[in-house]
């Protein structure tokens, strides 16, 4: 579904975090292997080729202490500025100390891209890339951005800081594909982004066709998960 703004003359309304002194991202000691992270992500349906790409490009790491998966985002100078943590053995989620959400996890495709695909989490991002790979598309030519989570807010027309920063630094982007969750928070975030951008971009609302999020859709596609209605009938 495409949502076209009507007021292109108005500038986008970006909600920015309060100015704060830049702090360094504190990276923990790394594991000598990435076996736990690779096993965990493959169990979520992520293709090994995409996992290896992220490892080789220092976008994905495994911590030595708890063997958490770490998804790292960089600024335009190549400095690590954000780290999302995901346990490989529990439901724990967190962020590295010193993380700045302006620089959340992303995969950049061809230079001067016109399209960007936007997700709530790094795992949803990698799930979409996997679906593209399985469909025979050139997944590395696309540009993908994780918002590092979306939240309910009392403010209207809020553009997440990760997206506003990315758009500022990539003026070639004119089409935004939102692949946010099929829940109240995800739907509210779509509404806020569309309102906040004020018609400056073509925004496409493209939630997962199956399941709550893009990873659910991937797991259903590859047989790792059944849709809720199918489970209820069994």
For each of these PLM feature ranges, what is it?
Residues 9-10:
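Accessory, often N-terminal, substrate/partner-engagement and coupling regions
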Residues 130-234:
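TOPRIM fold recognition
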Residues 118-123, 149-152:
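Conserved mixed alpha/beta catalytic, RNA-binding, or beta-rich assembly cores of soluble enzyme
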Residues 123-124, 189:
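Acidic, divalent-metal-coordinating active-site segment for phosphoryl/phosphodiester hydrolysis
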Residues 13-104, 108-110:
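Basic, glycine-enriched DNA-binding surface that flanks or lies within the catalytic cores of DNA
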Residues 41, 71, 78, 120, ...:
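Terminal peptide-recognition signature
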Residues 112-117, 175-176:
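Short active-site oxyanion
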Residues 3-4, 185:
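Charged interaction scaffolds used for protein-protein
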């Amino acid at each position: 579904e495409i949502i076209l703004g009507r007021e292109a003359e108005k500038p986008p309304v970006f909600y920015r975090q309060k100015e704060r002194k830049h702090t360094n991202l504190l990276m923990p000691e790394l594991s000598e292997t990435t076996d736990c992270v690779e096993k965990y992500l493959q169990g979520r349906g992520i293709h090994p080729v995409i996992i290896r790409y992220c490892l080789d490009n220092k976008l994905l790491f495994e911590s030595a202490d708890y063997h958490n998966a770490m998804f790292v985002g960089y600024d335009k100078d190549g400095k690590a500025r954000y780290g999302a943590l995901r346990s490989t053995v529990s439901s724990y989620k967190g962020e590295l100390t010193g993380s700045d959400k302006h620089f959340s996890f992303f995969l950049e495709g061809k230079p001067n891209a016109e399209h960007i695909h936007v997700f709530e989490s790094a795992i949803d991002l990698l799930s979409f890339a996997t679906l593209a790979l399985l469909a025979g598309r050139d997944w590395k030519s696309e540009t993908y951005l994780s918002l590092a989570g979306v939240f309910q807010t009392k403010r209207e027309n809020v553009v997440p800081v990760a997206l506003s920063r990315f758009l500022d630094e990539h003026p070639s982007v004119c089409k935004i594909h939102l692949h946010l969750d099929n829940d109240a928070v995800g739907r509210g975030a779509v509404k806020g982004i569309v309102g906040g951008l004020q018609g400056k971009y073509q925004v496409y609302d493209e939630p997962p066709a199956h399941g709550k999020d893009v990873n659910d859709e991937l797991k259903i596609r590859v047989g790792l998960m059944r849709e809720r209605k199918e489970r209820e009938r069994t």
